[in-house]
Amino acid sequence: MVWLIGISFVQSEVVPSDPYATRETKALLQRLHAQVGRGVLIGHQDATAYGVGWKSESSRSDMKDVCGDYPAVYGWDLGDIDQDRNIDGVAFADIKRLIREADARGGINTLSMHLDHPVSGRNAWDNTKVVHQLLPGGAEHEGFLATLDLVAAFLADLKRDDGTFIPVVLRPYHEHSERWPWWGRTNCYEDEFIAL
């Protein structure tokens, strides 16, 4: 009986779907899995970039001002990755620095990608059908790959002082079940979205 009780406290290892996941990514997955059933992790978009009545103040966060601590989860956006600043007006160089700072505090970083419409050049909310043109053989495939190369370069630069990569939760096409984005459920077929 004691043995059975003892084994119930052993936490099973979660195996990532990516066989090439880094040790840091596996550790983040374990950390998230360990949180299940224990409570909620509070997150805040652009938490340390700007807030109510302030912008670019070192170590500042509205959540810290109000609650006394930083959020557990920090959200950032890669929209306008081909520019100096993202869609929220935060410089990408600052985002990298703030991701490193959040990671050093034990925070979890997430990255969404509100990429501009690849054909019209308008924002992500232009829901003109385009996904089929981004896939291999499509007219916009090469241009889309160039954008993804910018995303990859950004991610490759997210390293800790010891040179290890900072794990992030990448949410490239979030809210895909909605109608508003060009990648949304009414703007492409399921197989196109999966291929994307």
PLM ranges: what are they?
Residues L4-P16:
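Bacterial Sec-dependent signal peptides at the C-terminal "C-region" and cleavage site
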